[in-house]
């Protein structure tokens, strides 16, 4: 993966005290987080000590690691900008979704795929969608459901419950 040049600049891994510099640093980190998640097809991140060993927060070439407390500040800013969302509204907030594609973008991609596959009027299970359309196999069940709920609100699909009583598929109304 091609990393941004700032990733090799040691001060990038230290929270800057000057407000203007910190604002720029947060923006650079947000771009890096979105790029890293997109390249790794990761839509959620768990904030824990193991994360400190990942290439997201640790640059082994320059021996620098972004502290988790600073990472949390950056994530909070991403949440305010709708680039991320905590999976739980209550504390502790340890897991978040990263929107390197918005819910709407995911929905549009699914609709295009359904249209290209001639699926209008047919029924599709969540499993079938993620097995056949590899672009969305990185979405966890909850995030996929959020995307499909948006499509339902727009009148594109009708969610269907399986024998377990949980939503497990949908009928394509208009792709």
Swiss-Prot record:
It is a peripheral membrane protein. Signal peptide: none annotated. Its main location: cytoplasm. One of its GO terms (biological process) is late endosome to vacuole transport. GO terms for cellular component: cytosol; ESCRT II complex; nucleus. Keywords: Cytoplasm, Endosome, Membrane, Protein transport, Transport. Component of the ESCRT-II complex (endosomal sorting complex required for transport II), which is required for multivesicular body (MVB) formation and sorting of endosomal cargo proteins into MVBs. The MVB pathway mediates delivery of transmembrane proteins into the lumen of the lysosome for degradation. The ESCRT-II complex is probably involved in the recruitment of the ESCRT-III complex. GO terms for molecular function: protein homodimerization activity; structural molecule activity. The keyword Repeat does not apply. It is found in: Cytoplasm; Endosome membrane. PANTHER family: VACUOLAR PROTEIN SORTING-ASSOCIATED PROTEIN VPS25 (PTHR13149), VACUOLAR PROTEIN-SORTING-ASSOCIATED PROTEIN 25 (PTHR13149:SF0). Belongs to the VPS25 family. This is Vacuolar protein-sorting-associated protein 25. Homodimer. Component of the endosomal sorting complex required for transport II (ESCRT-II). It comes from Schizosaccharomyces pombe (strain 972 / ATCC 24843) (Fission yeast).
């Amino acid at each position: 993966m091609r990393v941004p040049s700032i990733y090799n600049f040691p001060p990038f891994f230290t929270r800057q005290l000057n407000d203007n510099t910190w604002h720029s640093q947060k923006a650079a980190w947000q771009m890096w987080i979105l790029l890293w998640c997109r390249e790794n097809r990761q839509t959620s991140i768990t904030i824990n000590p193991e994360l400190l060993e990942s290439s997201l927060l640790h640059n082994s070439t320059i021996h620098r690691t972004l502290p988790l407390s600073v990472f949390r500040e950056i994530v909070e800013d991403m949440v305010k900008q709708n680039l991320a969302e905590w999976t739980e509204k209550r504390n502790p907030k340890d897991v978040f979704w990263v929107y390197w594609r918005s819910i709407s973008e995911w929905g549009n991609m699914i609709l295009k795929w359904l249209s290209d596959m001639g699926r209008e009027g047919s029924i599709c299970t969540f499993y079938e969608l993620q097995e056949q359309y590899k672009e969305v196999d990185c979405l966890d069940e909850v995030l996929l459901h959020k995307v499909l709920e948006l499509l339902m609100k727009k009148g594109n699909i009708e969610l269907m419950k399986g024998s377990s009583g949980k939503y497990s598929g949908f009928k394509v109304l208009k792709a």
